């Protein structure tokens, strides 16, 4: 097993681009481990990471802004390959004596580029390509020792390179899928320029994480916030493999679970994996706290707090418990805000924790994306029934019932969601659709059922396709399948007379409604 410092890795420096997490994700697709770090990292800290290559992300600043994000300039002298993307290319240009100016017109969207001087970055790629641009400044004079490698109609210097020092810059965003050959360019950087072997796998990851968990925990005990979803289930099996019965799983039935979920969780994880699970019936406790609350952020905070307090109560019955495990993912951390990104919404695993929490946190999945977690689950020998379960938020149905939560509303969402999952399975679409669920938007509308007028609830069906959860598109479910879903919901679920389908992508929307 390799030590982390010996592992091939490409570090992405975060200069505030909305796409920076995609760079990390793309690099991992090539079997090369990659992490996102703040631009404030020092050269000493960077050397300790021992990267094989570095990527400077894009960002919203101008390099001439007084408060523009900077990098430790000594990083350029480390003698390892660096790729500057958009703002990153402009930083590289000014550092080495080139010139950057404000563009007459901001360039945003698809653009045609021409590769004037092919190099290792463009090995095997066509000279004419469609890419995604998003910039307000541009390079007007390349630095000494660099060559202009790419041009476009509105950006005469769209790429630069110093092959001898393995320094490259591109004005466009290869990490965005609109850049047709962007993946291939990043792969060339990782494998051709940096010389990575591309042998990072979930087997490597699990070996490293198991060793880390054993080292951190020692002979202490760990509590896991087990929700029954993919993330907490995978982290539970991973930690159980590391420390066995030192792990106690606290499965809280807060009354916000999907239909039949509690029984399935106990049967699978306790029955098949012999995990130590304490089931806590806390339905009344949660519903009392949530009574009259309609604000989504307040609901998340209440649910998050009550979860921790329940764990605290259970932990007091056990000896030697020092750690709380969570299934926090990389996307959770990113969406909850970083030093250079605006908070979208507080996440149940990284927000809402009480200040007096008594446990130390263990989050072994917090560098993984959702598809990587599924791959890890398979590597750990978990059945598809768990690994490919629909993603389920920690607050459960509490954020799929918009507005105040009542038992009647919860039953509507449970029953409608069960029908949706049945019909998606019957249509053979389970693996094609990344996430699908129903939500209750707290909207009533007039309808006619039988010979009478109704004034009942509207159910929203949400289904999206995605690879990593950072971006998502609404799923093109066949009309006949949507019809079956709608007919069954209005006929089988009480107090529902209308079904609508959400056809909004992420962005601008998030996957969940709250």
Curated annotation (Swiss-Prot):
Residues 9-199 form the Glutamine amidotransferase type-1 domain. The keyword Membrane does not apply. It comes from the Bacteria. Residues 200-389 form the GMPS ATP-PPase domain. ATP binds at residues 227-233. The active site is at residues 86, 173, 175. InterPro entries: Class_I_gatase-like, GATASE, GMP_synth_C, GMP_synth_GATase, GMP_synthase, GMPS_ATP_PPase_dom, NAD/GMP_synthase, Rossmann-like_a/b/a_fold. CDD domains: GATase1_GMP_Synthase (cd01742), GMP_synthase_C (cd01997). One of its GO terms (cellular component) is cytosol. PROSITE patterns: GATASE_TYPE_1 (PS51273), GMPS_ATP_PPASE (PS51553). Its EC number is 6.3.5.2. It is an enzyme of class 6 (ligase). It catalyses: XMP + L-glutamine + ATP + H2O = GMP + L-glutamate + AMP + diphosphate + 2 H(+). Pathway: Purine metabolism; GMP biosynthesis; GMP from XMP (L-Gln route): step 1/1. Keywords: ATP-binding, Glutamine amidotransferase, GMP biosynthesis, Ligase, Nucleotide-binding, Purine biosynthesis. GO terms for molecular function: ATP binding; GMP synthase activity. The keyword Oxidoreductase does not apply. Homodimer. HAMAP family: GMP_synthase (MF_00344). Catalyzes the synthesis of GMP from XMP. This is GMP synthase [glutamine-hydrolyzing]. It comes from Listeria monocytogenes serotype 4b (strain F2365).
